[in-house]
């Protein structure tokens, strides 16, 4: 893949719509907290750079990545939000658990996008090593939390 080793967190600031009136929910997994907290920091900083008021960013934590889908659904049901970002990190181990968690979260976020009239943004790192996760949580390949925030803002403004 051509973009596999690029820092995609660099973008044209002016290509992102004003977000000053947006309310954004973020659900972040506590598992691999050293990574997910960096993703959260990146997402919040980027949202604020584009005008989202800190008080309009609702952050909720769930124990692990598999719980992200339920957390996102519950957040969308209980708060008036324009988008929900899910942030997590799953690192491949020696068992098929990685595949089950990644597939479950991917399918769950897809279903939420089809069920609700707001975008649910996939910010789940699915990596083979912890180093790959660190590289994508503020390391040499940027911060995928930043990218999830930009995606959320753009999708709130999406119109067919």
UniProtKB/Swiss-Prot annotation:
Keywords, A to Z, come to: Riboflavin biosynthesis, Transferase
One GO CC annotation:
riboflavin synthase complex
UniProt keyword Transferase, yes or no: yes
**One Pfam entry name:** DMRL_synthase
Q: What class of enzyme is it?
A: transferase
Catalytic activity line of the entry: (2S)-2-hydroxy-3-oxobutyl phosphate + 5-amino-6-(D-ribitylamino)uracil = 6,7-dimethyl-8-(1-D-ribityl)lumazine + phosphate + 2 H2O + H(+)
Q: Which PANTHER family match?
A: 6,7-DIMETHYL-8-RIBITYLLUMAZINE SYNTHASE, 6,7-DIMETHYL-8-RIBITYLLUMAZINE SYNTHASE DMRL SYNTHASE LUMAZINE SYNTHASE
What the protein does comes down to: Catalyzes the formation of 6,7-dimethyl-8-ribityllumazine by condensation of 5-amino-6-(D-ribitylamino)uracil with 3,4-dihydroxy-2-butanone 4-phosphate. This is the penultimate step in the biosynthesis of riboflavin.
Could you identify this protein by its name?
6,7-dimethyl-8-ribityllumazine synthase
Taxonomic lineage: Bacteria, Pseudomonadati, Bacteroidota, Bacteroidia, Bacteroidales
